[in-house]
Curated annotation (Swiss-Prot):
It is an enzyme of class 6 (ligase). This is Malonate--CoA ligase ACSF3, mitochondrial. Keywords: ATP-binding, Fatty acid metabolism, Ligase, Lipid metabolism, Mitochondrion, Nucleotide-binding, Transit peptide. It is found in: Mitochondrion. Its EC number is 6.2.1.76. It comes from Bos taurus (Bovine).
Length: 586
């Protein structure tokens, strides 16, 4: 290692150590709080273990340039050694200490994530648009022992890290350019990866406070290999990545899958309809042939198309290019409105592949790759995934629930008398998460007594496919691919000096899936406009959680227990809104 780099690294490490006032304690050793069935293979090593075999193949293209698999591996190895040096970890194993990371949508995220894993840590991805208070909560709740930050995020995270007494390690320029000089030392210690914690992703829950979903390396392997098989990933694929990197869709489906098989990922810093269309239609190599997004992005791409591709010959060209070059287009993270699916097919010739998943289970259901897809359905179970549709057993004699249908990749068996009966979806398999971080009671409550994860989603099996009917709980709003906790938004809005009561509801929306709407009562003599509320809320809420609509009412109806029936509230306030709950629905 050249001397200039050594000096720079030591200065950065010294800064990181100096910022640490309190040493975060590590979680005591304990086994998993539930056991998933064994995977088909014990080969649960992380994706970076596969990288050396791909060598000089092109792994990533971003605003910084082109990066090979060898580049990613050696840069990650170098950073992992810095992490271990900072944590005084002589044997190179952090033993599941948490490593928070805030990076842009570029090579820095991959290197930071791989480095966290190489050093034996659990990666905790953060999001730059989250308010500082929420970033502080994630770092503190996960008890991260170090925070990695891209240079553009150091200013945001520095005061947070100092307040919490957690060392902040800015990513060096070598993360973005160059390779290590001593590849003969480029080996990661042998470890038993299978049950080792890999990643904590924070997701909203019905309690309102975000919960950390801890997945193991084997959980991630199960999701990735299932998708690789189902969607026929190969090293020749080139995917365009435009999603944030703090949830499963962006991290696993769009990043780890291509890197698992030696394919190429083209990353944009953020979504731009113009740039996406330019990439689709470009003749430059490598050419995009896979795309995945949330329904909101497809709506925005169609808006751009309507404004800029007005000539018939241009529209014919767009459709021809998309049909010829692109093999797979996927929609997920929120329900796909049928008009969006139909219009997109008319523009590109592609019937969007709909699938179903969530942070706790990865991906569970998917439409077929080549066979006909039923619009609105989410297909059948992925490899290794078992599902059940159930309802409560009123007798509670032999089982706490009644099984309507039970399925796997091979087939689904429906219980006689329960044909096309709705129920809650249960999931079991090696992709199901290990635990809610530091929340044993909530982890236990999330599973049935016989080990199935309760998704909280109402589904039905008909026409050979599974159909999602909606959340069992109305307090999780899916807007633009994000999951928004209505209870958390309510809790924060009640801090506004003019608001006395609030109910946050999800109203069906063509573009966003659901729009976050705040129903509010005010202090006597006070006034509040939607613009004023948005300006105030931006300081405490993520952009996608800021209410897009404000309704002022004299009183919010509550029952004797003080609870709001939000389905009734949506029906009352939006009786003609398409997709609003029907009378009597539960």
């Amino acid at each position: 290692m050249p001397l200039p780099y050594v000096g720079m690294a030591l200065r950065r490490l010294a800064w990181a150590v100096a910022s640490c006032r309190l040493a975060p304690w590590t979680r005591g050793a304990s086994g998993p709080l539930h056991s998933a069935p064994a995977a088909r293979s014990d080969c649960s090593a992380p994706v970076f273990i596969r990288a050396p075999a791909f060598g000089d193949r092109l792994a990533l293209i971003d605003q910084h340039g082109r990066h090979t698999y060898k580049d990613l591996y050696l840069r990650s190895l170098r950073l992992s050694r810095e992490i271990c040096q900072l944590r005084a970890c002589a044997d190179g194993d952090l033993r599941e200490e948490r490593v928070s990371l805030l990076c842009s949508n570029d090579v820095s995220f991959v290197v930071a994530q791989w480095a966290a894993w190489m050093s034996g840590g659990v990666a905790v991805p953060l999001y730059r648009k989250h308010p500082r208070a929420q970033l502080e909560y994630f770092i503190q709740d996960s008890r991260s022992s170090v925070v990695l930050a891209g240079p553009e995020h150091v200013e945001l995270l520095s005061p947070v890290a100092q307040k919490l007494g957690v060392p902040l390690l800015p990513l060096p320029p070598t993360v973005y350019h160059g390779v290590a000089e001593d590849p003969e030392e480029g080996l990661v210690l042998e470890r038993n990866w299978r049950d080792r914690g890999a990643m904590i992703i924070y997701t909203s829950g019905t309690t309102g406070r975000p919960k950390g979903v801890l997945s193991t390396h084997d959980n991630i392997r199960a999701v990735v290999t299932g998708l690789v098989h189902k969607w026929a990933w190969t090293k020749d694929d080139v995917i365009l990545h435009v999603l944030p990197l703090h949830h499963v869709h962006g991290v696993v489906n769009k990043l780890l899958c291509p890197l698992w098989v030696g394919a190429t990922c083209v990353m944009l810093p953020e979504f731009s309809a113009q740039l996406v269309w330019e990439k689709f239609l470009s003749s430059e190599a490598p050419q995009i042939n896979v795309f995945m997004a949330v329904p909101t992005i497809y709506s925005k791409l169609m808006d751009y198309y309507d404004k800029h591709f007005t000539q018939p010959h241009v529209q014919d060209f767009v459709r021809a290019v998309c049909e010829e070059k692109i093999r797979l287009m996927v929609s997920g993270s929120a329900a796909l409105p049928l008009p969006v699916l139909e219009k997109w097919k008319g523009i590109t010739g592609h019937t969007l592949l709909e699938r179903y998943g969530m942070t706790e289970i990865g991906m569970a259901l998917s439409n077929p790759l080549t066979a006909a897809r039923l619009p609105g359905s989410v297909g059948t179970p992925l490899p290794g995934v078992e599902v059940r549709i159930v309802s409560e057993n009123p007798q509670k004699d032999s089982s706490p629930y009644l099984i309507h249908a039970e399925g796997s990749e091979e087939n689904t068996k429906v219980t006689p008398g329960f044909e096309e009966k709705e129920g809650e979806l249960l999931v079991r398999g090696p992709s199901v998460f290990r635990e809610y971080w530091d929340k044993p009671e909530e982890t236990k409550a999330a599973f049935t007594s016989d080990g199935w994860f309760k998704t909280g989603d109402t589904v039905v099996f008909k026409d050979g496919c599974y159909w999602i009917r909606g959340r069992t709980s109305v307090d999780i709003i899916k807007s633009g691919g994000y999951k928004v906790s209505a209870l958390e938004v309510e809790r924060l809005l009640l801090a506004h000096p003019s608001i006395t009561d609030v109910a946050v509801i999800g109203v069906p929306d063509m573009t966003w899936g659901q729009r976050v709407t705040a129903v509010v009562t005010l202090q006597e003599g006070h006034s509040l406009s939607h613009r004023e509320l948005k300006e105030w809320a931006r300081g405490v809420l993520a952009p996608y959680a800021v209410p897009s609509e404000l309704l002022l009412v004299e009183e919010i109806p509550r029952n004797q227990m003080g609870k709001v029936n939000k389905r009734d509230l949506v029906r009352q306030l939006y009786p003609h809104e398409k997709g609003a709950p029907e009378a009597g629905s539960q």
